[in-house]
């Protein structure tokens, strides 16, 4: 019999799923797992070591296996170096989309994510959590937001990290959406049993409160 409660939250880049997932996890007292940071960490690590997943897959996989990655919510360390802020840059986001399309890397990450979920009450966010990683999750959400709103949010979030303009961010998000939705391996899509939430007109507190209310209605009453 299943011992732990798993909540899956999926959605496109910049939809606020990670922030909402963290807020919901805190409200529930659950472990929060940001799977997107795993792929960003892998992408950053490979780029820093001049390794290209498209030209030297074996070396990339071995390098990742031999490195020490520590994931704790939004905090990430690679071989004891804190890279949490670096991973939020737009450049790393684009690199991560390419790395995440690799089947062997996704398999490596998916196995780790499933192991964590089997040992904890978790709120896990990503792009294929409800459809691939945790198909038996107790509750699945799909957060959706217009590209315009996502671009404005990312511009505000990254203003102290890098100099970007709205148009370049908009185009990057549009390109990433296309890649994520059309890739052969674990494409971004809403699980058939996921509850879709459009959050353009919600602030963080409203979004978390809405997810929490649904959780109480779906899980607590079951």
Curated annotation (Swiss-Prot):
Subcellular location: Cytoplasm
The species this protein was found in: Ureaplasma urealyticum serovar 10 (strain ATCC 33699 / Western)
Entry-linked SUPFAM superfamilies: P-loop containing nucleoside triphosphate hydrolases
GO MF, one annotated term: dCMP kinase activity
Location, primary (coarse class): cytoplasm
GO CC annotation terms, alphabetical: cytoplasm
InterPro entries registered for this protein in UniProt: Cytidylate_kin, Cytidylate_kinase_dom, P-loop_NTPase
Matching Pfam families: Cytidylate_kin
Known EC number: 2.7.4.25
Source organism superkingdom: Bacteria
One GO biological process term: pyrimidine nucleotide metabolic process
Residues that bind ATP: 11-19
Official protein name in the record: Cytidylate kinase
Enzyme class: transferase
């Amino acid at each position: 019999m299943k011992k732990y409660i798993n909540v899956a939250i999926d959605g496109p880049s910049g939809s606020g799923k990670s922030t909402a997932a963290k807020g919901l996890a805190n409200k529930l007292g659950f472990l929060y797992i940001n799977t997107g940071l795993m792929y960003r960490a892998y992408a950053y690590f490979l780029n820093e070591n001049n390794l290209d997943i498209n030209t030297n897959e074996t070396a990339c996989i071995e390098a990742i296996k031999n490195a020490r990655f520590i994931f704790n919510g939004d905090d990430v360390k690679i071989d004891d170096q804190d890279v949490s802020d670096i991973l939020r840059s737009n450049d790393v986001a684009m690199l991560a989309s390419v790395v995440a399309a690799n089947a062997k890397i996704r398999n490596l990450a998916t196995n780790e994510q499933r192991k964590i979920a089997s040992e904890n009450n978790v709120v896990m966010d990503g792009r294929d959590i409800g459809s691939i990683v945790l198909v038996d999750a107790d509750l699945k959400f799909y957060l959706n937001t217009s590209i315009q709103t996502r671009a404005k949010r990312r511009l505000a979030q990254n203003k102290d990290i890098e100099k970007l303009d709205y148009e370049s961010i908009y185009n990057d998000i549009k390109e990433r959406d296309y890649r994520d939705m059309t890739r052969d391996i674990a494409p971004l899509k809403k699980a058939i049993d996921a509850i879709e939430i459009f959050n353009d007109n919600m602030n963080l507190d409203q979004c978390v409160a809405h997810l929490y209310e649904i959780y109480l209605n779906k899980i607590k009453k079951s």
